[in-house]
């Protein structure tokens, strides 16, 4: 059950010819847990998340969720996946709260106000809840994106450099919270920060 990659190969066409990002990749992820994905830039870490999210379907092999190909699962991205992007993907003219509510509304999820308040306090954004996102710093926007993903209770959360704009204190706080949250879901984090390894027994390292 859970998420599984079977003989997955991803290639890109370049001016020089065809470039293989990874070939015959086989991974059977646990149903829950925090998994760090590290490695040099350009080795396929973010590409792997794009494939798992169903955003890139140009690959060979199979990606399965609960033994069903993700392409065959109705509303897979809506019901199964929450994605935290490097560039946040927030709506600037909406408030912190409305960004969270709108994202969950798109996924058909009713937000529990108490849960939202708890997350706002954990990530120290409770005093900015009605601020428009365009007025926030990069680190604050990153925390809003994290809250939004966690609110939706998706079984899989994909994070592409989710702590890049955070200072060291908030970075460690996010890692600790993700470790706790991963007791109920699978969280995959692409990161250049090797310190994440101490928060998880699972570690995938990509080499070019």
Question: Residue locations for each model-derived region?
Answer:
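Conserved ABC transporter NBD signature motif
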Residues: 61-71
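Conserved ABC ATPase "signature" region
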Residues: 113-128
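Conserved ABC ATPase signature
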Residues: 132-136, 140
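ABC ATPase NBD coupling module
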Residues: 69-82, 181
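Catalytic Walker B motif of ABC-type/P-loop ATPase nucleotide-binding domains
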Residues: 157-160
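Helix-to-loop junction immediately C-terminal to a conserved catalytic motif
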Residues: 53
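A short, flexible loop at the N-terminus of ABC-type nucleotide-binding domains that lies
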Residues: 1-5, 10-24
